[in-house]
Amino acid sequence: MALTGAPTAPLHEQRAGGAGRVGAPAVMVRMRVALLRHALRDTDRAFWIWFAGGCGLLLALGTVVACGLDPDLGAALLAAWMLGWVVGPLVSGGDEALRAEMFVATGLSRWRLGWALLTSSVVGVAPVVSAVAVLGVVAVGVRGGVLATLLAVVAAAAQLAVLLTVSRVAVGVVGVLVRYRAGAVLAGAVTGLALALPSQGWALVAALAARDATQTLAVATRAAPSGWGLAAAEAAGRGAWGLAVGAVVALLALAAGTFALWCVLLQGRTTRRGASIRPRRLLSARGPAGATVRAHLRSSARDLVQINRFAFALAYGLFFCALPLLVGWTGMLPWAGAVFVVMAAMVWSNQYGRDGTALWLQLVTPGARRIDLLARQGTFLLATGPLALVLTAGLVAAAGTPASTWPYLAAALAAALGAGAGVTAAMSVLAAVPTTDPHRRGGDVLASGGDARETGTTYLTMALVVGLTLPALVVARLAGWWGAVAGVATGALCCYLLTRVALRHLDEQGVELLTLLRHGRRPTAGAPGAVPGRRPVELTGREQAVVLGAGILGTLMLFPQGIVPAVILRGGDPTTRSWFLALHVPAAWAWPVVAVMITLGATLYCVSVWRYRRAATAARGTAVPVPADA
């Protein structure tokens, strides 16, 4: 089926006399449907798709209800949806199943190609969930009568079109920026700020409330493009048809303008200038370990995607800890170094997956696996450690942090560096997610080929690093500077043990890992060419839901609702209750609530680990098939 202006119909359609002329949009829609159907056949990917879709659907229904009850709150939530459409693809790597580079040989103009790609982008879970969310505009229009409802339906459709086109433009602009080092740093900083704002939104809300700016915020959310549909529905309800029609026309014009801009950006992806080759200074290092470390440092400095993610981690740490300055609180500022290390571990958690099939070099070279893994850890420590130390020391001096806080900072930094080095190595081997090989990436540098599994791996890495850092903080709370010693010991122990686990897995299942990175899936049992070993742990959708759900709930109950309130209560009368349940109940019930939360969290953790270990035990000893061409 050709993707040209007048495609040739299949032979059986021509004989039947049917109109076999199928346009490019219809073909790409079918391709997207086929890709989605194929993804749902994979148990692992299907679980993440349905899990994310279910959570998104709940949020979308909440947005519809909020728009119907409180339009001000609904406008703020619609703004959050637009922010999510802008930031989400940047974090996940563009999320382009069909890329413009794939259709260069079809002869389609950039306008027709852009229209076909945009049309096909409505196929998926995220657009459907977003379509439910923008029904909040219709919920507001229903109160104004039949005509207002009809106009609200048009406004909701235009609002959805704006979400799709603005998201594409954001990915396209950042994709252009990350082709240059300065642009990659700028794009990473903007993404870090965009993600830090929701994380520390309480500071922004408190600052606005202190200045009595809630009404100004309500006006601003309606003035933003995300609120134009809601403003049109409200105007139609009160009979201001000129304003209502004008808002809808503005939405349509914005959708058309962003679509045109995206088509212009597509031109740069389908045509490319020749690259200039400049001689590079030769590496000089003593021994294979030093040479490998320097090679990884150089490749990281030249990889624009890695530069972008490193800048994101640094910007997130700075903005996350600096936003409380809006309410005059400097207490979080010195923690920017530790937060930066945690975020850097997140973006470092899929090293082998991002390098792709280059793993075969380590598999066929005797002794190279150990050297390469240790060099990757050394690269992480050299790239993050000195910068985190300078950042922490500088912000301690700038904020005038009291000396009583220094043991906590030292403990957190030491433990986070060691745990980050160990966890990133283990996750890169045990939970590798295949992506597009670097030499096969297209014009969109962000489109690395990852999916929701890579996002889940990054968040699991963050939870593990934070969890392994907490014991050192507890020791610092109880014994002062001994917490720093505990942090060094904890970090070193975690790094040593997790490195051993990763090396053992590489030795035993390195071929299976290469198969995963090459073919996008692990080998299935019973196929020809099986080799002795352990079958990869495969969980059913129900088991995945239990393991993941128990792990997430256990994390929420054990740390935010258990350990953190206990530390606050131990320090005296809490002044900030935030969302800690134990701080909102009467004083007599505070410690019992903490005990219940810690018990429930630990129990859920045990359930999650037990279910996973049971599946791992069942997989142990089963033959692992490897394709003959692996």
Residue ranges of each PLM-predicted region?
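Hydrophobic alpha-helical transmembrane segments of membrane proteins
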Residues: 2-100, 109-358, 369-630
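Helix-capping/transition residues at the boundaries of transmembrane alpha-helices
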Residues: 103-105
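Catalytic phosphate/nucleotide-handling subdomain of diverse soluble enzymes
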Residues: 360-366
